[in-house]
Protein backbone atom coordinates (compact mmCIF):
# COMPACT_ATOMS: atom_id res chain seq x y z
CA UNK A 1 0.00 0.00 0.00
CA UNK A 2 1.16 3.42 -0.86
CA UNK A 3 0.28 5.86 1.89
CA UNK A 4 1.80 9.12 0.73
CA UNK A 5 0.88 12.35 2.38
CA UNK A 6 1.34 15.69 0.77
CA UNK A 7 2.00 18.92 2.56
CA UNK A 8 -1.01 21.19 2.87
CA UNK A 9 -1.14 24.11 0.47
CA UNK A 10 -1.04 27.57 2.02
CA UNK A 11 -1.34 31.05 0.62
CA UNK A 12 1.86 32.97 0.00
CA UNK A 13 3.25 33.82 3.43
CA UNK A 14 3.61 37.45 4.46
CA UNK A 15 5.48 39.03 7.31
CA UNK A 16 8.82 37.64 8.35
CA UNK A 17 9.32 35.58 5.18
CA UNK A 18 7.82 37.97 2.68
CA UNK A 19 9.42 40.46 2.13
CA UNK A 20 12.66 38.48 2.19
CA UNK A 21 15.05 39.31 5.02
CA UNK A 22 17.98 39.71 2.61
CA UNK A 23 16.16 42.47 0.75
CA UNK A 24 15.24 44.20 4.02
CA UNK A 25 18.87 44.10 5.18
CA UNK A 26 19.88 46.08 2.06
CA UNK A 27 17.93 49.03 3.48
CA UNK A 28 19.79 49.21 6.81
CA UNK A 29 23.38 49.04 8.00
CA UNK A 30 22.94 45.87 10.08
CA UNK A 31 20.41 43.30 11.20
CA UNK A 32 20.29 45.02 14.58
CA UNK A 33 19.38 48.35 12.97
CA UNK A 34 16.63 46.59 11.01
CA UNK A 35 15.17 45.12 14.21
CA UNK A 36 15.10 48.50 15.97
CA UNK A 37 13.75 50.27 12.86
CA UNK A 38 10.92 47.76 12.36
CA UNK A 39 10.07 47.58 16.07
CA UNK A 40 9.77 51.36 16.39
CA UNK A 41 7.53 51.57 13.35
CA UNK A 42 5.40 48.65 14.55
CA UNK A 43 4.96 50.46 17.88
CA UNK A 44 3.81 53.60 16.04
CA UNK A 45 1.28 51.58 14.03
CA UNK A 46 0.01 49.89 17.19
CA UNK A 47 -0.28 53.25 18.99
CA UNK A 48 -2.16 54.65 15.98
CA UNK A 49 -4.82 51.93 16.26
CA UNK A 50 -5.06 52.40 20.04
CA UNK A 51 -5.63 56.16 19.73
CA UNK A 52 -8.37 55.94 17.08
CA UNK A 53 -11.11 55.50 19.67
CA UNK A 54 -9.94 58.58 21.58
CA UNK A 55 -10.08 60.89 18.57
CA UNK A 56 -6.41 61.81 18.92
CA UNK A 57 -4.38 61.72 15.72
CA UNK A 58 -0.82 61.88 17.02
CA UNK A 59 0.60 58.88 15.15
CA UNK A 60 0.70 58.00 11.45
CA UNK A 61 -1.23 54.91 10.43
CA UNK A 62 -0.07 52.18 8.06
CA UNK A 63 1.36 53.39 4.75
CA UNK A 64 0.51 50.09 3.03
CA UNK A 65 -2.85 48.36 3.02
CA UNK A 66 -2.80 45.97 6.00
CA UNK A 67 -4.21 42.48 5.68
CA UNK A 68 -7.27 41.43 7.64
CA UNK A 69 -5.36 40.11 10.66
CA UNK A 70 -1.87 41.29 9.80
CA UNK A 71 0.33 42.21 12.74
CA UNK A 72 1.91 45.69 13.04
CA UNK A 73 5.42 44.22 12.66
CA UNK A 74 4.49 42.63 9.32
CA UNK A 75 3.04 45.94 8.14
CA UNK A 76 6.21 47.76 9.24
CA UNK A 77 8.43 45.30 7.36
CA UNK A 78 6.38 45.76 4.19
CA UNK A 79 6.67 49.56 4.55
CA UNK A 80 10.45 49.27 4.91
CA UNK A 81 10.64 46.98 1.88
CA UNK A 82 8.60 49.44 -0.21
CA UNK A 83 10.95 52.32 0.78
CA UNK A 84 8.03 54.30 2.22
CA UNK A 85 9.98 55.33 5.32
CA UNK A 86 13.14 57.32 5.92
CA UNK A 87 15.55 56.04 8.53
CA UNK A 88 18.71 57.51 9.98
CA UNK A 89 21.01 55.63 12.31
CA UNK A 90 21.05 56.63 15.95
CA UNK A 91 17.41 57.64 16.30
Curated annotation (Swiss-Prot):
UniProt xrefs under PANTHER family: DNA-DIRECTED RNA POLYMERASE SUBUNIT OMEGA (PTHR34476:SF1)
GO molecular function: DNA binding; DNA-directed RNA polymerase activity
Enzyme class, UniProt record, top EC level: transferase
Upper classification of the organism: Bacteria, Bacillati, Actinomycetota, Actinomycetes, Mycobacteriales
Keyword vocabulary terms for this entry: DNA-directed RNA polymerase, Nucleotidyltransferase, Transcription, Transferase
Protein EC: 2.7.7.6
Family matches, as InterPro entries: DNA-dir_RNA_pol_omega, Pol_omega/Rpo6/RPB6, RPB6/omega-like_sf
Stated family: Belongs to the RNA polymerase subunit omega family.
TM ranges: none
General function of this protein: Promotes RNA polymerase assembly. Latches the N- and C-terminal regions of the beta' subunit thereby facilitating its interaction with the beta and alpha subunits.
Claim: Cell membrane is one of the keywords in the record: no
Superkingdom as given in the UniProt entry: Bacteria
Subunit structure: The RNAP catalytic core consists of 2 alpha, 1 beta, 1 beta' and 1 omega subunit. When a sigma factor is associated with the core the holoenzyme is formed, which can initiate transcription.
GO CC terms: DNA-directed RNA polymerase complex
Reaction catalysis annotation: RNA(n) + a ribonucleoside 5'-triphosphate = RNA(n+1) + diphosphate
Originating organism: Nocardia farcinica (strain IFM 10152)
GO term, biological process aspect, one: DNA-templated transcription
Signal peptide: none
Name listed for the protein in its UniProt record: DNA-directed RNA polymerase subunit omega
Gene name tied to this protein: rpoZ
Amino acid sequence: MSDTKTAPAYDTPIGLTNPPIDELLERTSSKYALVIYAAKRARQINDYYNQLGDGILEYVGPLVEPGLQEKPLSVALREIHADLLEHSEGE
